[in-house]
Amino acid sequence: HSSQASVIIDQHGQRLVVPFHDPHVSQDSGWLPIDQLKHAGMLHCDVRWVEGARHALTAARALGTPTMVDGDVAPLHILQQLMPLADYAVFSDAGLLAYTGLQDVKEALMQVAQQHKAQSRHVGASCGAEGYWWVEDGQLQHVPAPQVQVVDTLAAGDVFHGAFALALLEGKPVRQAAQFACVAASLKCTRFGGRLGCPTRAEVEAYLQAS
């Protein structure tokens, strides 16, 4: 069986995900249609299926297709395998701290940016209501998240990654892409549901124009 999860949402809109990953599912990644990556604008992977992600990321790099990895909380050995394969290493704040063993997001970002300077063109961390931090030309940069009434944070990180990748592929500079992604993720948090709560592009652009 593929992975399943129960999601518990409290009265403040914060979510707890309780996942189940079937240990009997084959980890073989040989069936992946790797040749299709040459037509992709970007490959985005998370840390849930390390064999598949490693295979696809390695192939994408060989083909010259940009890669992005969602550096969420995972066993350290998994993060150590996947994050160096990311052109865009986009951590969650908790994932970044788990990867570095540090307690401060800004310090951790600077450390990873230095360590990955030969592998990654971008290192950043999404920090929920605190917005998005990244390192550019050796300096910390920040985009705040809009302050919203939170109903449900489920899938906010996924929305951020998708919107960020889209904006980058459309040629937006990182700051503008991060603003677009922060607004998209924040609007998602005002609605119940994961996929059902995703905002439309028109809604995100209308918010940006009004702010």
Describe each PLM feature range.
Residues 1, 24, 51-52, 74-77, ...:
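Short alpha-helical
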Residues 1-41, 204-211:
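Conserved N-terminal subdomain of the carbohydrate kinase-like
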Residues 14, 66, 88, 140, ...:
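Residue-level detector of anion-binding/catalytic polar loops
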Residues 20-22, 91, 145, 200-201:
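Active-site donor-binding loop signature of nucleotide-sugar glycosyltransferases
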Residues 33, 79, 150:
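Acidic, amphipathic alpha-helical patches
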Residues 35-38, 84, 118:
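Structured loop/turn residues at beta-strand edges in well-structured enzyme cores
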Residues 41-110, 131-132:
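Conserved beta-alpha-beta core of the PfkB/ribokinase-like small-molecule kinase fold
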Residues 76, 105-211:
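Conserved phosphate-binding/catalytic region of the ribokinase-like
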